[in-house]
Amino acid sequence: MAETAKEAYLALIAARDPEIRALLDQGFEFVTNAFKVDAAPSGMKARTDQEHVGRLQQAGYQVEVTAVYDEQGQLRPSLSAIWRKKP
């Protein structure tokens, strides 16, 4: 049984998406979910997925972007999941 809500969520999405399972197996760490460019609700200030990727790459991380699933395992097409790994 998962020890935390985050671990339970990661287990759920890894079971749904082989790309996410592969990233976890390769040692990638989940960072955050972020809106895709032009997908944030009007008037909301938020960093986009591309902004997160750029900042992490500047910090020296290998970065991957995948689909996002909610807590019920449903795809969220306006969001991207950001993953990082130190090379």
What are these regions (language model features)?
Residues 35-71:
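Short, hydrophobic/π-rich interface segment
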Residues 7-9, 20-21, 53, 72, ...:
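Generic N-terminal initiation segments characterized by hydrophobic and/or small/turn-forming residues
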